[in-house]
Structure formats: C-alpha cells, structure tokens
Regions:
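Ser/Thr-glycine-rich phosphate-binding loops at phosphate-binding pockets of nucleotides
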Residues: 332, 336-337
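Thrombospondin type-1
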Residues: 17, 29-64
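C-terminal motif of bacterial Sec signal peptides marking the signal peptidase cleavage site
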Residues: 20-23
C-alpha cells in the first residue's frame, strides 16, 4: 500500500510539474508567434506581426490586430545624388580660375558672397483611410548618424525645405517627421547626402557680408582643418555710429546662434575712434555671446608689427576652447580679419596658395573695393616668410613667437583647429 502511495505521489508531482512548465512556456506566446525574420521593418513589438498595411512581404500576410497604430502616412525622401556644391556659378568659375583672375569675377563692389541653397524634398502618401491631417513637417539634418548631436532642425508647411551653408567634404543624414492633427507623428526613413570638397565653406547670414568658415581646407600633411569652430565675417553693427545700429537681422542672429552655435565675437575694430560703433560690453548677438574687443590699427604698413600686442591677446582667446564656436571681424571682414585668418591657416599648415584663395574670396563681399594677392604679400606675407623655418607653418609659428605669442597658445590653437596635439 505504501509503495502504491509513493508511486501515485511521483506521478502526481510529474503531472503538476509538466503543467507548470507548459504554463511558463506558453505565457505571452499566444499573442506573439515566432515568425520568420523579414525586412519590412514595421513589426509590432507585442505580437511580432506586421503593422504596415501596404507591406506585401510573404511573411507579413497576417497583420497586427491593433497593438500598434498602423502607419497613417508613408513619407518618401527625394534622393540627393552626386556631391553637393553650393557655390554659385560665378563663385565656382572664379575658384576654377587662377588666383590673379579673381577680380574679373568680383571686385568687392556688391554683395555676391551668398551661396546657392539646396532643396530637400519629399512625398507624403496616405496609406490608411481617415488618417489625421498633416499640420506641418519637421526636418532634421545632421552629420551624426544617431541624430544625437549637431542637429539642424527646420519646419515646413510644404513638402520641401531649403538649406544652405553646409560643411564641405561632409556626409549628412536627414529625415522628415510629419506632425499630425491630434499629436501623432509619422517619421520617414533616413537619407544621406554628401557635399563636395571644394572650399571655402561660405556661409549665408542675413545682414552680414563676407562670411566664411576657416575650416575645411586641407593642410600640407593631409589633415583637414576642422569646420564649425572659427568663422570670419564682416561687421554686425554699423561702424563709427554714435549709437549702436545693429545691421545683422533677426534671421541672421538666429542662424548664428541656433545653427552655427556662436559663443564669442572677437571685434578687431578700433575703439579709440569709435569704429566699433558704440559697442562696449555686449555683442549684437546678445548677452549669451562673449564680446571680445581686440582693436587693431588698420593704418600701418605692416599689420603684424603695428598690432603685436593685440595679436598676443587674440591668440590668447583663440587658445581657449570655451570660446568656440567663434566669429571674428573688423569692419568689412577683409584686411585685419584677413591677417588673422592667414596666421591661423598658416599655423595649421594650410598651403600658401590656398590662403591667398581664401583671402581673395572677400572680393565677393560688399567691401567697397577690390583686393589682390599683392595687397597682403607686401604688407605681411613676405614678413612672415622671413622667419626661421622650412615650411610656411614653421615660419608662421616662429613669426608669432617673435611677436610675443606663447608657444603653449600656438600649440593649443593648432590642436583645436586640426585635432592634432603638438608633441603627442
């Protein structure tokens, strides 16, 4: 009898254990069949069934019954092929020609420094009945494939948006989100576009002429100077005015602050004669931007010798990573601004002819007269090249050392602008 009870107990325990295992294995699986993997990318995370009513994949015949709201719209991005170059036809013709022909394309008498815009377009197709109305679109454009940093955001009521001032030689990612009535959204897949390598990167800022990125140029050792850190431009407010008369528009301010992310403005205009136009402590961009007056004399036969104290101050600011992104300018963003651009570029290893090319592009700005290579050769380039060194980079480094700029500041600027740590 006892033997029978023990056998019955074992059988009962086995039955209970089997039932328990079945319950555990079956938990949640009645709603989540293990379907073969497929590529439609529209599967419900609850039941693993396809939620796209337009999907015709063989393994997607069975559709989700409602765990996820079906896609209301399909957004298809227009492909941007080739390498995008936003220079105008006139700018490109000039860049393709010799340095000495620049003034035959632009002579500094009118505003020609703005570039073309790129239209990003898409198509929107309703794929369900009674879909909520599209209110507007949000477009995100970034160099980060995860869309977690450096994102430019645009809004549009139409199926396109115009963008400009893109970095050169750069891969961009973009996507579009439709914002629907009621708060729902639909987001497109990600598309990619690539910009051409042709410099300089010219920037469109409403109310400011002659805006360019010092980055993008290749150095003699193949390094590319970082973009998005240091911008040269013309003035933001009217020079020599007794009261501050801001010339950059609200649209221009928004672009500098929201898209370029400007943190500091270095003003090279004279203070003693009020060339700064009444500015004292606050940038025309607002109190969030550090205003750094570095008054340089423009009436001197050698801009380096005549402004050595300010050059030391300027490179102290340039050596501080917290100052970036930074804009710097004089009155029209050409001569004193051109000197600092030449010194920074030369220090980083940008070839001499490339530095001339960048300087001469100021002729496309409204600068009140033309400039040639000889303008800066006689003023400071020959002076720099008299310094010790085999290369222009070495000569620029030693010239600035002799001017009084500490080596640690020069090394810091090179590191910031190229990502190459000196002595590493």
């Amino acid at each position: 009898m006892k033997k029978f009870i023990r056998i019955a107990s074992v059988i009962l325990c086995a039955m209970l254990l089997s039932a328990l295992l079945f319950a555990c294995n079956d938990n949640g699986n009645t709603d989540k069949p293990q379907l073969p993997e497929h590529d439609c990318n529209h599967t419900c995370p609850v039941c693993n069934l396809c939620v796209d009513p337009t999907c015709t994949e063989k393994d997607c015949a069975n559709k989700c019954s409602g765990h996820v709201t079906p896609t209301a719209y399909k957004i298809s991005l227009d492909f941007v092929g080739g390498k995008v170059d936003l220079h105008t036809e006139l700018q490109q013709q000039c860049l393709d020609d010799t340095l000495y022909m620049t003034t035959s394309y632009a002579n500094g008498s009118k505003e020609l420094s703005k570039t073309n815009e790129l239209k990003l377009a898409w198509k929107t197709e309703a794929v369900t009945d009674n879909a909520n109305t599209v209110i507007d679109y949000t477009v995100k454009l970034t160099t980060d494939p995860t869309f977690n940093k450096d994102v430019w955001t645009f809004s549009s009521f139409d199926n396109d948006v115009n963008v400009h001032s893109l970095k050169i030689a750069t891969k961009y990612y973009w996507r579009v989100t439709a914002n629907l009535d009621g708060g729902a959204t639909e987001t497109s897949d990600i598309s990619v576009l690539v910009t051409a390598e042709c410099g300089p990167r010219m920037i469109n800022v409403d109310g400011v002429t002659n805006v360019r990125d010092l980055g993008g140029w290749q150095t003699t050792d193949g390094t590319r100077v970082k973009q998005g850190l240091l911008y040269r431009c013309g003035r933001l407010n009217k020079s020599s005015s007794t009261t501050v008369r801001v010339e950059i528009t609200d649209k221009g301010k928004d672009f500098m602050l929201d898209y370029l992310g400007v943190k500091s403005e270095m003003d090279l205009r004279m203070v003693s004669n009020n060339e700064v136009g009444g500015l004292t402590y606050t940038s025309p961009l607002g109190e969030s931007v550090k205003y750094l007056p570095c008054p340089m004399d423009y009436n001197t036969s050698n801009l380096i010798i005549g402004n050595h104290e300010q050059i030391v101050r300027i490179f102290r600011y340039l050596a501080d990573p917290s100052m970036y992104p930074m804009i710097f300018h004089c009155n029209i963003g050409t001569d004193r601004t051109g000197l600092i651009a030449f010194l920074v570029g030369g220090l980083c290893g940008v070839p001499e002819d490339t530095l001339y090319r960048d300087y001469l592009m100021s002729n496309f700005g409204n600068i009140g007269g033309s400039r040639t290579v000889f303008t800066i050769q006689d003023n400071y380039v020959y002076y720099i090249k008299e310094s010790d060194g085999e290369t222009l980079a070495e000569k620029t480094y030693n010239c600035l050392l002799a001017t009084g700029v500490p080596a640690e500041h020069l090394d810091a600027v090179i590191g910031i602008m190229t990502g190459v740590a000196i002595g590493a």
